């Protein structure tokens, strides 16, 4: 009888490329979920479960794991708030005030975690984008939006402005229309 000898390659440990803030927020969410379960706070429990499932789905969908940072959390949280605001409008239109109130309370829970993230606010982004675009307008007054996006160093901007590339893009587009069209 022959024995097969398998060489067992040491399992490579999955390296997490997440920022420490990302991991801290997830840890806080899990701790708060346990606390909500022990205090039987159903609303907070479902809101935190929803947040954690959204984060997990984003982790699964992410092609580049290094993009899982506080900025991706900020984008996910703001998307969740926008979805709930849309739901509230629908519930009010259909005279379901009880469900609208539930979603308002979930927004409060999500906003609690959103405010804890060290990310620039929308007003800060708007002022930084305005300043940035005015500087570009002085050097190149006939700049087009496509040319602008080609000139932007996105890695430097996300670090300097403390915001995700997605939120910077949307802010620059909205401010570009105001500055370069006038």
Swiss-Prot record:
Keywords: Mitochondrion, Transit peptide. Pfam families: YqeY (PF09424). The keyword RNA-binding does not apply. It is found in: Mitochondrion. GO terms for molecular function: carbon-nitrogen ligase activity, with glutamine as amido-N-donor. One of its GO terms (cellular component) is mitochondrion. The keyword Plastid does not apply. InterPro entries: Asn/Gln_tRNA_amidoTrase-B-like, YqeY/Aim41, YqeY/Aim41_N. Residues 1-17 form a transit peptide. Its main location: mitochondrion. Belongs to the AIM41 family. This is Altered inheritance of mitochondria protein 41, mitochondrial. It comes from Candida glabrata (strain ATCC 2001 / BCRC 20586 / JCM 3761 / NBRC 0622 / NRRL Y-65 / CBS 138) (Yeast).
């Amino acid at each position: 009888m022959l024995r097969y000898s398998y060489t067992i390659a040491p399992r490579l440990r999955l390296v997490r490329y997440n920022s420490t803030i990302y991991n801290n927020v997830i840890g806080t969410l899990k701790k708060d979920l346990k606390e909500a379960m022990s205090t039987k706070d159903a609303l907070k429990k479902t809101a935190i479960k929803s947040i954690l499932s959204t984060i997990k789905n984003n982790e699964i969908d992410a092609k580049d794991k290094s993009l899982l940072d506080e900025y991706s959390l900020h984008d996910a949280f703001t998307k969740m708030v926008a979805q709930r605001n849309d739901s509230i409008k629908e519930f009010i239109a259909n005279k379901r005030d009880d469900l609208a109130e539930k979603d308002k309370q979930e927004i409060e829970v999500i906003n609690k975690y959103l405010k804890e993230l060290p990310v620039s606010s929308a007003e800060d982004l708007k002022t930084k984008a305005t300043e940035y675009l005015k500087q570009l307008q002085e050097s190149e007054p006939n700049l087009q939006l496509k040319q602008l996006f080609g000139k932007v160093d996105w890695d430097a901007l996300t670090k300097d402005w403390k915001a995700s590339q997605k939120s910077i893009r949307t802010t620059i587009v909205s401010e570009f229309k105001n500055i370069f069209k006038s």
